[in-house]
């Protein structure tokens, strides 16, 4: 299928979210627990395959003590593929095949079994669902042309993993939390109510999305890049039939809009928590300012260092935050069982690592960490757990992935561990990858490509 350069840019850029979302933890102190992979052997009978036809997988760390009947499931993130060429390439990597995945993963942050780092969930059964379908566990189709064979079976993978976990104790869960980061965070919006339907009626079941509230944004060139991308994704991978029917009916004749969390949110019945940065780095770089919307490179310096942004660019960033809060306002005002933590950091995924989830230097709003806010919401401690941070540059507790202040820039060039060790380690890679993408776009942005 023929796509615009705009979609090619976004597809290529997904490698950023792969690293940012689920890289090895960059934290000082004790390492997290390493957990082995479990292949879903019965998945083949359900037609549940990764893109390349390999079996899906998950990692299970058993709960103990008072948490032995409680479960937390985390969708892995890692972008999407919306056309045949990008899915063919993805199938040759760990994002499209369990053959290339690490057989063990480290559990940190909300999956940590350390009581001091994860006091509310440390002793629960913890599961990471490996991501290998390229469509947030939502597709149900396949493609074959005699040369390539691709399985778009994310929905079946989701079902197969749940069916594998039910006899292992999930069917008797007392408490459960479905969560995920990035593309996995988007998965929680798509599967939250379905998750609830599998569990006992008297179980306390809730869902939390981390960095998964992808906006239907208008970019700086007045295009809807993400809408175009998701529309092709929904069509290619046969997602429409798995979207919430109440939502697709409400948004007919554009059912693919229901892949956006802002549109499906009001149809979700299960209590929901939204963790997101109002200046999410992935959305800043590929929703608000995708390379195709800035072919002359006017935004290059700003995208790599927020202190280099001019007043017009800062206004656009503040406008993006305003749009995100606007999309969340009905939920903020009217959801009696919902929770939220919307800070003003240049970050992407904050529940997966100790230093942003719960540590002495974790991000805070009203002096509450993310872990404290989520715990208060889940267990009903105190008043409503809905926190919205003040706009950039007022938040001094951030772990920014790109420099957003003079202190961030100095930290990224300083030796040793500091307040922003995650940003320190990731800044160089982030800059390198972005310069690579800018180079590619400068070479090819004047043409359309079959991707």
Swiss-Prot record:
KO phenotype (gene knockout): Reduced inflorescence stem growth and increased levels of acetate in rosette leaves.
A cellular component annotation (GO) from this entry: extracellular region
Subcellular location: Secreted, Cell wall
Keywords assigned: Cell wall, Cell wall biogenesis/degradation, Glycoprotein, Hydrolase, Secreted, Signal
A Gene Ontology BP annotation from the UniProt entry: cell wall organization
One GO MF term: pectin acetylesterase activity
Active site: 182, 280, 348
Classification via PANTHER family: NOTUM-RELATED (PTHR21562), PECTIN ACETYLESTERASE 9 (PTHR21562:SF69)
Family to which this protein belongs: Belongs to the pectinacetylesterase family.
Protein name: Pectin acetylesterase 9
């Amino acid at each position: 299928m023929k796509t615009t350069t705009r979609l090619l840019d976004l597809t290529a850029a997904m490698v950023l979210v792969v690293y940012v979302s689920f890289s090895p933890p960059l934290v000082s102190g004790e390492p997290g627990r390493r957990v082995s992979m479990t292949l879903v052997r019965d998945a083949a009978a359900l037609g549940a395959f990764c893109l390349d036809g390999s079996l899906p997988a998950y990692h299970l760390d058993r709960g103990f003590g008072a948490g032995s009947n409680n479960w937390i499931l985390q969708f892995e993130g890692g972008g999407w593929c919306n056309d045949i060429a990008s899915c063919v390439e993805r199938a040759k990597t760990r994002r499209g095949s369990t053959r290339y995945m690490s057989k063990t993963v480290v559990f940190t942050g909300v999956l940590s079994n350390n009581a001091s780092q994860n006091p509310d969930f440390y002793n629960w059964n913890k599961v990471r669902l490996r991501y290998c379908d390229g469509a947030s566990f939502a597709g149900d189709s396949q493609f074959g042309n005699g040369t390539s064979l691709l399985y778009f079976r994310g929905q079946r993978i989701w079902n197969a993993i749940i069916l594998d976990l039910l006899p292992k104790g999930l069917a008797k869960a007392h408490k459960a939390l479905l969560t995920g980061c990035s593309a996995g965070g988007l998965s929680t919006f798509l599967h939250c109510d379905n998750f609830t339907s599998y569990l006992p009626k008297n179980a306390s079941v809730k869902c939390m999305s981390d960095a998964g509230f992808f906006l239907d944004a208008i970019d700086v060139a007045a295009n809807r890049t993400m809408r175009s991308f998701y529309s092709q994704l929904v069509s290619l991978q046969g997602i429409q039939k798995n979207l919430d029917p109440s939502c697709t009916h409400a948004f007919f004749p554009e059912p693919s809009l229901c892949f956006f969390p802002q549109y499906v949110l009001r149809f979700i019945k299960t209590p929901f928590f939204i963790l997101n940065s109002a200046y999410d780095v992935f959305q800043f770089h590929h929703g608000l300012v995708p390379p195709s919307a800035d072919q002359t490179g006017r935004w290059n310096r700003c995208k790599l260092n927020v202190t280099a942004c001019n007043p017009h660019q800062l206004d656009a960033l503040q406008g993006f935050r305003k749009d995100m809060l606007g999309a969340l306002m009905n939920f903020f005002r009217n959801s009696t069982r919902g929770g939220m933590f919307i800070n003003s950091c240049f970050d992407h995924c904050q529940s997966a690592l100790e230093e942003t989830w719960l540590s002495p230097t974790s991000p805070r709003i009203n002096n509450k960490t993310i872990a404290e806010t989520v715990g208060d919401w889940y267990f009903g401690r105190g008043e409503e757990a809905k926190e919205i941070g003040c706009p950039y540059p007022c938040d001094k507790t951030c772990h920014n992935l790109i420099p957003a202040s003079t202190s961030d820039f100095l930290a990224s060039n300083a030796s040793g561990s500091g307040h922003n060790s995650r940003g320190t380690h990731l800044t160089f890679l982030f800059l390198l990858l972005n310069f690579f993408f800018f180079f590619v776009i400068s070479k090819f942005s004047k043409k359309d490509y079959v991707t």
